[in-house]
Amino acid sequence: MADRISTGELGRRPGQGRVDLLLVGDATRYFLAGSVQKFFSSTAQITLTISNVKKVAALLAANSFDIIFLKVTSTLTAEEQEAVRLIRSGKKKNTHLLFAFVIPEKLRGYISDYGADISFNEPLTLEKVNTVINYWKTYFTNTDMGNTELPPECRLYFQTSCSELGGHFPTDLFLCSELLNNDTGLGLKAPLSSPERNKKASFLHSSKEKLRRERIKFCCEQLRTLLPYVKGRKSDVASVIEATVDYVKQVRESLSPAIMAQITESLQSNKRFSKRQMPIELFLPCTATSQRGDAMLTSAFSPVQEIQLLADQGLNVYSMPAAGGPLEEAVRGQPGSVSEDLYKTRVPSTTLSLNSFHAVRYCSGPVSPHEAAARTNQNISIYLPPTGPSVSSFTPQHCNAMLCPTRPASSSCLCTSGHELPASSRTASSSIFRGFRESDSGHQASQQPTGPSLQPQDSSYF
């Protein structure tokens, strides 16, 4: 049931109006409720209703509100979008209704105002609440409340609040109808006319299209880096997309049906790939990652070569943090299965684990002698330089020297003397290593570490 708070007993004076407020959102809406109640307690009689989005329809049908605050913490769900539709429908019947929309800071610039009269970003401050109230008193009420001067105690309270913030008013508050001006008075303009609204809507659409084109440009640059080099191939957007489609088809054909079924099932059951999530990833982990939070672009080396090499050996493909992470023990304890918790954590590397629990893990950058000595006998980590040609360092000759001394009696070890890969794997591996051997010989000498160093940390994009 919705919570109702009334301040009619707090000394209503002549000339004051009655204000009915509705706060809709998650649990953090109670912070806004305290700020609004403290401000109105000296200026008007208020009735404050706090509810969730499921009860908005019943409340709007039974009551007439003056100001409605809608607070969200992520992209709008279907219930929240329905609440917005009901509020906008109620504005047609109630011309004195002000719709205020509180947007999370992390979604600033990526979420629409949904037709709200005034929108502002978190964090919530009393100055923002003050602006909302003054805007409503000026343009959404016909009572004498707009001409009522604030009492001295209320003015003193906001002066103290402003001084505590260093004398700076929030700069991330904006009106959906018009931006704030620099007047010393109210600092607001009247709502825009219909032509001006259409002009602003056109400008907003243009800005969104520009952002979309920038995202496409960034993704194409990343695809150019990830795709194998082909002499004479065009670098325009259409050619890059066509080459990506052909390359993905080639990779899918090289994988066994069991591996493809496992990847498909993992992507379908993973909530990280739902429509509500911001990150967008391809069907192969660590191939291309896009995140909207930061204006940065990171490219992780594709594990396609390792997948092609070990596709017929009954491997499990899953994401895993660096050695010693909290998820490493969970992987060892569940043979032949993929833990759902692993897919909920974004990690910088991709592990290809054999059924014998030998984990061949790669990451960019050199490794210090101390870190190399700390590896256990069940996990052999091969640190490759940050360039693609270094994959050729993982050859069967190197495996005989590194993997076999660890578990010489293991029947599933790929490096046992006399053990040969299937014909399909040999064909795939030979095509992979042939293009990298020449560049690898001159690259290994330049990648020798001169001293202890830290592994580079992956940064997120978007």
From Swiss-Prot:
Keywords of the record: Developmental protein, Differentiation, DNA-binding, Nucleus, Oogenesis, Spermatogenesis, Transcription, Transcription regulation
Domain bHLH, chain residue ranges per copy: 200-251
CDD domains: bHLH_SOHLH1_2
Biased composition (Polar residues): 442-462
One Gene Ontology CC term in the entry: nucleus
Protein name listed in UniProt: Spermatogenesis- and oogenesis-specific basic helix-loop-helix-containing protein 2
GO biological process: cell differentiation; oocyte differentiation; positive regulation of transcription by RNA polymerase II; primary ovarian follicle growth; regulation of gene expression; regulation of transcription by RNA polymerase II; spermatogenesis
Residues annotated as signal peptide: none
Location in the cell: Nucleus
Function: Probable transcription factor, which may be involved in spermatogenesis and oogenesis.
Coiled coil: none
Disordered: region residues: 422-462
Any one Gene Ontology molecular-function term assigned to this protein's record: protein heterodimerization activity
